C-alpha cells in the first residue's frame, strides 16, 4: 500500500515504488527506516522534497514521514478527499496533490467497490 495516499498496489496501474523519505541528496540513507512504499503519483509529486512552505505563514513545514508519523494523526478521509488535520498533513496533501480531480475519482470508484477505506486506525 502507498504509505502516503493509502492506495493498494493491486489498484494501481504501475504498482508501488520505493521512496527515500529523506532523499539521498539531503543526507538520507538507503536503510529500511528511511524507505517507504509509494505509488507512482505520490512519489513523482514528492520527488526529493522533505518540506514545503505553509500556504498562509510561509513558514517551512516538513512533510509526513511514514516511519515516524501516524497517518491518522495527520490526515482524515472525508468522502474521497484526504484532508490534512495538522500543518504537516496540510503541507503533504498540497505538495503530493492528493486531491487532484483524477485522484478523487480513482478513490471514489475504489470506495464504491469496497477497495479503499483509507486508514482504519
Name every feature range the model reports, one short phrase each.
Residues 1, 26-29:
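Short, charged surface segments at domain edges that flank catalytic/cofactor-binding sites
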Residues 17-26:
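Short Cys/His-rich Zn2+-coordinating modules
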Residues 20, 33-34:
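Hydrophobic alpha-helical segments
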Residues 8-10, 29, 33, 44-121:
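Extended charged
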Residues 1-16, 36-46:
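Short cysteine-rich loop/turn motifs with clustered Cys
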Amino acid at each position: 500500500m502507498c504509505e502516503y495516499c493509502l492506495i493498494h498496489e493491486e489498484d494501481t496501474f504501475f504498482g508501488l515504488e520505493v521512496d527515500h523519505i529523506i532523499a539521498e541528496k539531503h543526507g538520507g540513507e538507503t536503510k529500511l527506516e528511511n524507505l517507504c512504499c509509494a505509488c507512482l503519483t505520490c512519489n513523482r509529486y514528492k520527488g526529493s522534497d522533505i518540506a514545503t512552505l505553509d500556504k498562509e505563514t510561509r513558514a517551512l513545514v516538513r512533510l509526513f514521514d511514514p516511519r515516524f508519523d501516524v497517518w491518522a494523526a495527520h490526515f482524515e478521509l472525508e468522502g474521497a478527499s484526504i484532508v490534512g488535520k495538522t500543518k504537516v498533513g496540510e503541507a503533504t496533501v498540497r505538495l503530493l496533490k492528493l486531491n487532484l480531480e483524477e485522484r478523487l475519482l480513482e478513490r471514489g470508484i475504489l470506495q464504491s467497490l469496497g477497495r479503499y477505506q483509507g486508514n482504519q486506525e
